[in-house]
């Protein structure tokens, strides 16, 4: 599916210079609750206006298409210190290449075997931590009750903070797999108490199992309405 999608897109769009497969399909356990996303990144000569696209294949499988500009890969030094793009380019599966792009960028990224060494690893972790702290500071002095916008920022802050710990032992964790994989990552760095801390920051101490079960039907209804609206 990834190859077919890539062939179709590059045939109709000469701006695409490369494409690669990344994400959970490259992991040992790509499925989550019987569902999976196929994550494809297209690299363009110039960044298009629409940088993200989701395509439903079946109720359980979707294409998650990201678009990046070639200029984002110019500096190997910056790429090694990027907590997201660095890992994304470190070991993906190349699907297409119009120009000589992929091998050069990947070789520069891997040069000297420095990528996974403590100095660069800590640099990436600190970037995530700084980003999370910055978002937290932005919402910590609200002069009005928190609404959906502030809750979204809070969740993003927590997302970056959790990944600041996760990236000590591997690549950052995507949103949909965050709680599923964080326990093993915290254990890998001997910080198992952070798992309970993360759940606590999500409000787990304020709800019980029965209450959550009561929300499921409302979630299903809202999801159905959102899906119908998007179609």
State where each predicted segment sits.
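Proline-rich intrinsically disordered, low-complexity coils
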Residues: 14, 30, 59, 92, ...
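Internal, well-ordered alpha/beta segment that forms a basic, Gly-enriched binding/recognition surface
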Residues: 70-141, 145
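Short secondary-structure transition/capping segments
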Residues: 63-70, 113-116, 195-197
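Aromatic-residue detector
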Residues: 13, 29-31, 40-46, 54, ...
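Metal-dependent nucleotidyltransferase catalytic core
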Residues: 1-17, 22-91
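Generic hydrophobic, helix-prone segments enriched in Leu/Val/Ile
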Residues: 1-3, 100-109, 198, 202, ...
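Solvent-exposed, charged interface segments at domain starts and junctions
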Residues: 1, 83-103, 107-110, 114, ...
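Conserved nucleotidyltransferase catalytic core and NTase-mimicking acidic/glycine-rich helix/loop elements
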Residues: 120-231
